[in-house]
Design a protein with these regions (language model features):
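Domain-level signal for soluble alpha/beta catalytic cores
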Residues: 1-197
Length: 199
């Protein structure tokens, strides 16, 4: 019988405590970094165990350390500031009462979405290494080796953190590709699979 390996994609639920810390961090409020790191480590360990126990073959760290799957880049790369215009999905335009209800219920993301306003430069080389270490430790705790780590494609970053500095989006995408190479290489060099998010 042929075994078909199973996996999934996307962020996984964080604990209320971690969600609160991520929101505070995103709002540039002062947080205790050692407490944050410990909470991320705990959440990664728990989410890896849950995935394995559910029968998945290839598991992820659930993106526990990140406020969102794309905008966390603003915390690791210099060159972003301000706030970008938020556009509701086009399909909601056909249902204005539902769209209004969704907005009033808090069903729209409130995390920061700045624009690229200056030259992009890596400012944080440590966070991706922490993510990898937490994930590899959680895999080892569970005697599991098949793991993948998500990272946004340059196109996704361009969509969520729009260009207001480079002469056009092609130049912006090229610069993002150069910048993201660091994170992509760290993930693959660690022996983990790299899952590029492109939507």
């Amino acid at each position: 019988m042929v075994k078909i390996k199973t996996t999934h994609v996307g962020s996984l639920p964080r604990s209320n405590e971690l969600s609160s810390l991520l929101a505070s961090k995103d709002n540039q409020e002062k947080i205790d970094i050692s407490s944050f790191d410990a909470m991320v480590k705990k959440n990664v360990s728990e989410v890896v165990k849950k995935q394995i126990n559910s029968g998945l073959d290839s598991v992820s760290d659930g993106e526990m350390s990140k406020i969102s799957y794309a905008t966390y880049i603003k915390d690791r790369v210099d060159g972003f500031s301000g706030e970008s215009e938020r556009k509701a999905p086009k399909d909601l335009d056909d249902f204005p009462s539902f769209k209004k209800k969704l907005i009033l219920s808090g069903g729209t993301p409130t995390y920061k979405r700045p624009c690229c306003t200056s030259e992009l430069k890596i400012k944080d080389e440590v966070s991706v290494k922490k993510d990898i270490l937490n994930f590899k430790n959680a895999l080892e705790e569970n005697s599991h080796t098949d793991g993948f780590m998500n990272s946004p494609s340059p196109g996704v970053i361009c969509n969520f953190l729009p260009n207001k500095f480079y002469k056009n989006d092609d130049e912006y995408l090229e610069k993002l590709s150069d910048i993201m190479k660091f994170e992509y290489e760290k993930i693959t060099e660690s022996g983990l699979y790299l899952s590029l998010i492109h939507i």
